[in-house]
Amino acid sequence: MLLTAEFWVAVAFVAFLVIVWRVGGFSMMTNGLDSRAKRVRNELDEARRLREEAAAVLADYKRRRTEAEREAEAIISGAREDAERIAAEGHARLNDFVARRTKSAEAKIAQAEAQASAQVRAAAADAAVKVSETLLRERLQGAAAQDLLRASLGDVKSRLQA
């Protein structure tokens, strides 16, 4: 048993462990592992902090985007209301303009009708006077006829034009 290779490997391994322990190798290994664990823990803490910071930035971005969307919607609805109001005002102004033009045209037509009617009456009166004058001239003779004719024609003319 003392001469087997496994025995001497075991003795050498135990001797190696004793030497490593004496030199402080175990404490160096544990210190190295502890420092590595500490560094990993710090990196995890930093990653957690960065993740929380990113989540806060994302939440802020979402809040700002929501506010911007609300503001844009308010601007759009305001613009729509303004456009509708302006269109309604335009329609009202157009309707007023058309009504004024119609009223003006109707007044001009009524004035033209009245003027035409007066001209027709005047022309009819003149024609009636001329016809009457011609008939009376042919039928009545003398100075008395002329005086009667003038008086009658003046009377007829004034009555027809009134």
Swiss-Prot record:
TM region(s), chain numbering: 1-21
Main localization of the protein described in the UniProt heading: membrane
Keywords recorded for this protein, A-Z: ATP synthesis, Cell inner membrane, Cell membrane, CF(0), Hydrogen ion transport, Ion transport, Membrane, Transmembrane, Transmembrane helix, Transport
Cellular location(s): Cell inner membrane
Record carries keyword Nuclease: no
Domain of life: Bacteria
GO cellular component, one term: plasma membrane
Pfam families for the chain: ATP-synt_B (PF00430)
Entry keyword Cell inner membrane: yes
Topology versus the membrane: Single-pass membrane protein
GO molecular function ontology, one term from the record: proton-transporting ATP synthase activity, rotational mechanism
InterPro entries on file: ATP_synth_b/b'su_bac/chlpt (IPR002146), ATP_synthase_B_chain (IPR050059)
PANTHER family (UniProt xref): ATP SYNTHASE SUBUNIT B (PTHR33445:SF1), ATP SYNTHASE SUBUNIT B', CHLOROPLASTIC (PTHR33445)
Subunit structure, interactors included: F-type ATPases have 2 components, F(1) - the catalytic core - and F(0) - the membrane proton channel. F(1) has five subunits: alpha(3), beta(3), gamma(1), delta(1), epsilon(1). F(0) has three main subunits: a(1), b(2) and c(10-14). The alpha and beta chains form an alternating ring which encloses part of the gamma chain. F(1) is attached to F(0) by a central stalk formed by the gamma and epsilon chains, while a peripheral stalk is formed by the delta and b chains.
Family in the record: Belongs to the ATPase B chain family.
Its biological purpose: F(1)F(0) ATP synthase produces ATP from ADP in the presence of a proton or sodium gradient. F-type ATPases consist of two structural domains, F(1) containing the extramembraneous catalytic core and F(0) containing the membrane proton channel, linked together by a central stalk and a peripheral stalk. During catalysis, ATP synthesis in the catalytic domain of F(1) is coupled via a rotary mechanism of the central stalk subunits to proton translocation.
Protein name: ATP synthase subunit b 1
Organism annotation: Methylorubrum extorquens (strain PA1) (Methylobacterium extorquens)
